[in-house]
Each structure stands twice: as C-alpha cells, then as structure tokens.
C-alpha cells in the first residue's frame, strides 16, 4: 500500500537528484553535465580496422592518421543510449567529442572535432558521410570526459514514453533504434 511516507520519500529522492545534477553543473561549468547519445551518428558498425579502411581517405585529407585517431577519445565511437559525462572546455582539440547546439534548436549534437581554426570548429559524426556546418565556441556546451555504455538508455525510454503521452512524434536523432533502448 502506498503511504504518505512513500510519497515523501519519492519527493525527497527527486529533490536530492535535482540538487545533485545542479551541483554537477556548477562543478563542471556546463548546464548539461550528463547527456545521452540519441542517434547512431557516432556508431562504428564494424571493427576499428575495417571502419578505418572505409573512412581513411576523409581523415587523411585532414592529416589525421590511423594512429592519431586511435589516440582520440572513444576511437571506436559511441552507441545510441551511451551516457556521457561533460565538462566545459573553451579550447577543445581535434579528436575531442563535443556537445553543441545549433541556434534555434532544442537538440544537442554529439560529434567529434575533425578540424579547427581559431574559435571555429568542424565536427563530424564518425558514422556520417560528411562533416557538419562549422560551429563557434559559443555553440559548444562542453567536451565529453568519459562515456558509460548504454546507461543513458533508460532516459531515452522515458523520453519516448513521455512523447507518447503528450502525442508528440518522437525523433531520437532519426537513426536511434528503439529496439535497442
């Protein structure tokens, strides 16, 4: 039986979680210290050597070697549902996985920096055929510090369930398979 005490414990748990998230935002310097990967744009669908064989021409044009790429954060890419921990970084490097937003969009994008000059960055999803339009430093939300495979899946499932109740068509990046969530 659900009691007032149970309700109070649930409310307290939500408040503690919210306070923890806000504290994490202050410590990391970004309003988004934890994000979930919502598309397959960073997914490597094959072993690294095979993946590199199909992508090497693009990266070679940018003077990024196979050895360079293997030293980048998450050289084997990210999967839909991975949970990322983010920190503010006003000077990310080539190879860093960054989170950014486009003006007028509510969505954030998780892609890798493949080129830069001054405070302009070219990003690309490892699984995408072409790079994104350039972004500025002001669009950056942060840089990925580490990833925890699939721990973001419950958040995506809750987002999907909420969208069903609200009657909003769900688009988890256009490529994220709900069967894997």
Region annotations inferred by a language model:
Residues 91-93, 104-106, 116-119:
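Short, charged/polar surface micro-motifs in flexible loops or helix N-caps
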Residues 96-98, 109-115:
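Short beta-strand-centered aromatic/proline hotspots
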Residues 65-67, 94-105, 124-132:
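Short aromatic-glycine motifs in intrinsically disordered, low-complexity regions
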Residues 114-161:
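Extended, hydrophilic extramembrane loops/domains of integral membrane proteins
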Residues 1-92, 148-181:
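Protein maturation boundaries and topogenic segments
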Residues 79-82, 93-96, 138, 142:
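Solvent-exposed, polar/charged alpha-helical surfaces in well-ordered, non-transmembrane soluble domains
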Residues 30-32, 102-111, 132-138:
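Short coil-to-beta-strand transition motifs
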């Amino acid at each position: 039986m659900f009691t007032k005490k149970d309700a109070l414990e649930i409310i307290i748990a939500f408040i503690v979680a919210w306070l923890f998230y806000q504290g994490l935002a202050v410590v990391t310097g970004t309003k988004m210290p934890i994000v979930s990967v919502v598309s397959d744009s960073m997914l490597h669908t094959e072993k690294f050597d095979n993946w590199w064989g199909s992508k090497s021409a693009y990266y070679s044009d940018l003077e990024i070697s196979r050895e360079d790429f293997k030293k980048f954060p998450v050289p084997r890419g990210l999967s839909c549902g991975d949970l990322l921990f983010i920190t503010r970084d006003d000077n990310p490097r080539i190879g860093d996985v960054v989170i950014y937003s486009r003006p007028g969009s509510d969505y954030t994008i998780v892609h890798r920096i493949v080129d830069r000059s001054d405070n302009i960055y070219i990003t690309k999803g490892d699984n995408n055929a072409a790079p994104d339009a350039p972004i500025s430093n002001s669009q950056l939300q942060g840089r990925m510090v580490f990833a925890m495979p699939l721990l973001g899946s419950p958040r995506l499932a809750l987002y999907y369930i909420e969208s069903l109740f609200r009657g909003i068509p769900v688009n988890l990046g256009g490529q994220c398979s709900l069967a894997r969530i």
